[in-house]
Design a protein with these regions (language model features):
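Hydrophobic, well-ordered beta-alpha structural blocks that scaffold small-molecule cofactor pockets
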Residues: 1-117
Length: 117
């Protein structure tokens, strides 16, 4: 139970850091578990510019509760930082969308590994 509040705190610190630097932050992958996390953290369209997604069934819609627009993943090059939302495929999404561009990111997976140290 304590761990989820630490994860929330780390996500909010990440967002605050990049917002204070006037950087644009996106979420990656409009998965249900990621949306649940965003709502738990109180993150909304004022915090994340959009959610990057590949599924045509989700693009041009909004996340429930947080009203963040869901856009085509090809738009990733326009952003400064990212939160990878589905923690079970963090490595795959990092390699696919962020690694070559060296965009800073966080994810539940990354935070949990950091907390274990």
């Amino acid at each position: 139970e304590k761990k989820i509040f630490l994860i929330k705190s780390e996500i909010l610190k990440f967002i605050k850091k990049y917002k204070n630097e006037k950087k644009t932050i996106v979420g990656i992958a409009a998965a249900t578990k990621g949306n649940t996390l965003l709502n738990f953290c109180g993150v909304n369209y004022k915090d994340l510019k959009c959610i990057i997604e590949s599924s045509p069934y989700k693009i041009h819609k909004f996340t429930p509760g947080s009203a963040i627009p869901i856009v085509n993943e090809k738009n990733i090059k326009k952003y400064d930082a990212a939160i990878i939302l589905p923690w079970n495929i963090t490595k795959h999404l990092y390699r696919k969308l962020l690694q070559k561009r060296k965009i800073p990111y966080t994810s539940v997976d990354k935070i949990v590994r950091k907390l274990k140290k």
